[in-house]
Amino acid sequence: MDLENNTLPGRSKMMTAIRCFANKIRSFYMLNIRYSGVYWGGVRTLVRVPLSTSIWSPHKDVTVGDRVQFGPHCRIQCDIKFGNSILMAADVAFVGKDDHITNIAGKTIWNSGRGDSQKTFVGNDVWIGHGAIIIAGVKIGDGAIVAAGSVVTKDVEPCTIVGGNPAKFIKNRFETLEEKEKHLQYLKMLYP
């Protein structure tokens, strides 16, 4: 770690080194002990997982790429694949779409069982705002931004900003198509 460039004003290099070490211990616990069934991307993986994060997958199919940061109290309750360079704020939830079968006459919801859960995909360079809810089975494209409090029920196009309930297109992340293409090419080069 480059302590020279990662030290905040007023914080000593020693405190930054101690925080970095504590972060590595917490991440080791979360990645190797608490969620040992999750595939964490590889040898050079930098993943930040607070202790308050909860991961449960119906088919134990969770993959997390490199440079992924979960905010406090994030909930993952579906099969999912995370790309690389993802930021998630606090209270982000990935929830199952077909958790309970509700349309069988003569059976209670309790006795009807569960439906098939679809896999969710989160691309590279994605930012998901505070309290967003992502319904299982959607694909969030590379470079997308999901606004705080959004409920994402449909796929999110690459390099777009969505928000609301249900989430709708707000605007493009980049002003021109050339900028968008340049960024997507950069991501393809960075994460082949």
Report the location of each language-model feature.
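Terminal amphipathic alpha-helical/low-complexity segments used for targeting or macromolecular assembly
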Residues: 1-37, 42, 85, 99-105, ...
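Conserved short histidine dyad/triad with adjacent acidic residue
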Residues: 48
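Flexible, glycine/small-residue-enriched loop-and-beta-strand segment within the central core
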Residues: 53-64, 69-136, 173-174
